[in-house]
Amino acid sequence: MYSDVFCKVYNEFGWNYYPEIFGEQLLEWIKRNNLNVKSSLDLACGTGVLCEIMHDYGADAWGMDFSSGMIDIAKNRNGNIHYDVADMTVYRPDRKFDLVTCTGDAVNHIAELSDVEKIFENVYAYTAEGGYFVFDLLNENEVSDSEPFEMDFTDTMKVWFQMTRPAENKVNLCIRVFEEGKDTFEENIRETIHDPMAICQLLKKCGFSSVTCSDRLLSDAENHSTTWFVVAGK
């Protein structure tokens, strides 16, 4: 579970840009496919940015995240959206959704394919007939070791980011916080790179009838180079 410090950094340091960009493309994808999305669920929703976008679109938007700190921030941002603190491997709400999403390479936070399969089984159970599950995955060919990247957080606080590849199919994102020049906090987010073909096969095994994987959600949109987009229809 993310620490309170990381949740604050995530919320205030501009990491909303990805769900905002994805949300714009998702709404266009819904429009182009002539979908009637009355309900949506965002898994690993973080601070709830995509939930807010779907709420403003007019859907009955829900969100869930393993981190109570993220959900606290999401609830403070918009108290009209239903949020749950839960583990995706066991989360199975007693209702169905027209659209289920999971972004920010959250599936890559799950190390074992057996646990990914549990998530897919759950998602299939609460996806409505004719509904869709849309999520992203890290693209192995586009993820490599990086030099530390530093940004000012406040006048006295800096945040330092670095991505490394400690093993063949592993990624580590290190976040360090410096206050008045002192190293005060460090968090490491460990992810596993999954074979997109294996992921697509798992989705079909769990019952999804149509599965596609591409480097972009919209054919004419700029691709997000580190990401695969997977669309699974029920």
What are these regions (language model features)?
Residues 134-202:
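SAM-dependent methyltransferase
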Residues 92-99:
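A short acidic, Gly/Pro-enriched loop at the edge of an enzyme's catalytic core
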Residues 108-110:
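A short His-aromatic
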Residues 103-105:
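Residues lining the SAM
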Residues 1-36:
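Conserved class I S-adenosyl-L-methionine
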Residues 41, 48-90:
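Class I SAM-dependent methyltransferase SAM/SAH-binding core
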Residues 198-234:
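C-terminal lobe and adjacent flexible extensions of AdoMet/dcAdoMet transferase-like proteins
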Residues 117-129:
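A short glycine-rich, Lys/Arg-flanked "PGG" loop and its adjoining helix->strand segment in the class I
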